[in-house]
Amino acid sequence: MDFLCYLHAGWDPLVRPAESTRPWMDATPESFAYRCLPLNIANAHGWEILSPCDAEAYWTGQSGPEAVIVKNAPGTQKQNAAVSLFGQGTVTFHIQALFRTPPGWDLFITGSPNRPKDGIMPLSGVVETDWSPYSFTMNWKFTRRNHRIKFQRGEPICFVFPVQRGALERMDPKVVDLEENPALEADYKAWSKSRDEFQANIASARSPAERWQKRYYRGVGMADEHPVADHRTRLRLKPFVAGEPAAEAVPTMTFDEAGLARIIGAATAAAREGATAAELAVALARAGVPGGAAARLAAACGEDAEQTLPAPSSYGRGPG
């Protein structure tokens, strides 16, 4: 799938596949923090956008934009400068890129995972980058007043990764007693017992290897089997490279009679409840319409879903 980064004239974003390393993890004894595979995967689970300049900011504690005093390094170009734009103790970076994800995919925008910065924190957002022609900003919020922070050129200021729109809404969360899954319960109890024994003996371990159970890291179950074929111990994301503009893909929608009835029913129910276009899009996505198509169908109904819905045939009885 293409993940595109469109550049306007004069834009030159510093974007790279995220690093799995962190200075604080390097500093742990024997770098033991890297034995935590979930940390490693999260660290590299996207692309980092780096600060284009050196900047310093100070927050007086007031709510207005003037309460954040930002000083950029001499010679910093205007489009690269950190600014105080929104108030509320925030520092803003304009991201010089227009990302385009495949149909039905959003972009999760946040700070680099497991990379704390004293006195300030990254804010997170989700943008529908499969259709939006709008750029976005990356914002950091002070966590205490009368505090000075610095951003260095080349420091990660933004972290992005695509997420499939509607996937969360299609999840059916359920609480189930563990005893209803005897195999899982047996494996859990065996692991819990082995973990207790391991923790009791860890102080007498003679080597680093003896202080690491490593079952999850190796993707091995309690019967020494490999439950999944696509277990990963690292991510290998591709860098952005020069390429030809891709044509906007149009998702193919194929529904049987039951699926079509479900979609029309969801749209009708949403309209009766006075749903907004955004709420209608969610209802359509839950009914099985791909995210990008759901947004377009909802938009076709106008800002208020009580307006006339598209004819059933426009929902795609077959390919198209």
Regions found by a protein language model. Name each.
Residues E30, P133-F142:
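Short, structured beta-strand/loop micro-motifs enriched in basic residues and often containing a Trp
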Residues F255-A283:
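Eukaryotic low-complexity, mixed-charge intrinsically disordered interaction/regulatory segments enriched
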Residues R317-G318:
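Glycine-biased, low-complexity coil/linker segments
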